[in-house]
Amino acid sequence: MELFSANYEENTRALDDLLGVGRCFDMISRDLYVGGRRARMWVVDGYGDDAVIERMLSFWLPLRDVSDAQTMQQFIDRYITFNEVNAEKSVKNTVTSVFLGKMALLVEGYDECALIDAKQYPARGVEEPSSGKVLRGAHDGFIETLVANAALLRRRIRDPQLTLEGHKVSDCSRADVVLCYLENKVDRKLLDEVRQKLAKIDVRSVSMSQESIAEAMMGKQQWWTPFPKVRYTERPDAATACVMEGDIVVLVDNSPAAMILPTHFFDFVQEANDFYFPPLIGTYLRILRIVVFLLTMFITPVWFLLVKDPARTQAGLEFLAIDSDYSVPLLVQLLLAEFIVDLLKLASLNTPDVFSNSFSMLGALVLGDFAVQAHWLVPEVLAYMAFVAIANFAQPSYELGYAFKLLRLMLLLLVGALDWIGLVLGCIVIVVLLAATKPIVGKGYLYPLCPLDKKALLALLVRKPISRDNT
């Protein structure tokens, strides 16, 4: 059955069967009389706003006659006082809408169903996200409810040019996806490209929210590159700034993060804290972040290259040499330290909050001391790996941090096998990977360096003062 008919019993049987009435404990179905006519309503328990539903029932039940409404649309106009309601002819669309949280109402004598958007999803408060914290500025954050996230953006951009364009993705989850952009700022060609990629997504479910959508939009052609193709933020102020700059912010229901398109490599230099400090300090923080990017990737491979040959540390670089004896090969020590850092990260993620801080500190101290006492690691290896671990948290993207880790491991292995030639070869591989990586949409991944846009590159490296043209 694709469309509702004038047969009330047939319509109710079809909806009962498709919605799982009797099979699903949380599917509520109630019979009632409205104006002397039989009627039935369906709603998922936990989705419906009880106060709204109660008010509507208290209005419908006393009705004596609704014969003046010849169609469901006329019934809606005269007897449903709620704002968000529409008549639906399709059975499939009705079922999907109920699973999305709407209440369905069938009334005898009509060949359409009323869909009332009286949903109220379970939601947490808009507290500040655990990542991307700022010293000053707003301390709210996105949550798992799409409507609330859209309201956080609307509250900051009170402009009629702001468009929140709704889409549905996947066959099974039917996830709500919203594109947020400014009509007078967005690149229309880029916007059309995003729409086309969303329309072509052919997956049953996007249970992992943005990551599932990002992978579906990218396809399989870029699986070999470790660099992230999208930026994520849980901060409404950061998402607002991107929209104001002409970017597209993608919100997905059930996700507390916003996806920012287009994304280029140098976009990761920026962070929300830059704009809560004066321009000079913001510029310093960006330059510091770039230096940290380079050190994170190269400090351990370069140090390993220098200490492999004692002669290289005699020309004013004696402080880099290893004083203590060691039995485990230095390359194995560095790799072991890398894996221990990841082990501590994974363990802290799965540790209850009450114990996580103390566990991280004690775990690092105990493991580090044990490794030195057992002659597994020399103190210099621990010192450099501690710097790398701290530096990873100085940049705002977890994905980029793990990309640097994989490239750092590659450099260590190449240096161990080929000495300085391995370092040069590894640098060439990194440059080729960066040049070959393609963003989901937009210009090249290395924009604004390649293709060169001096003005855009300067804006990324230097935090300019706020002005009318630079907001």
Describe the function of each predicted region.
Residues 249-250, 257, 263-411:
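Transmembrane alpha-helical segments that form the functional core of multipass membrane systems
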Residues 158, 199, 345, 372, ...:
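Short polybasic/polar patches that bind polyanions
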Residues 1-302, 306, 310-313, 319, ...:
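Membrane-embedded alpha-helical signal segments
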Residues 379-381, 385-471:
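Hydrophobic alpha-helical transmembrane segments of membrane transport and translocation systems
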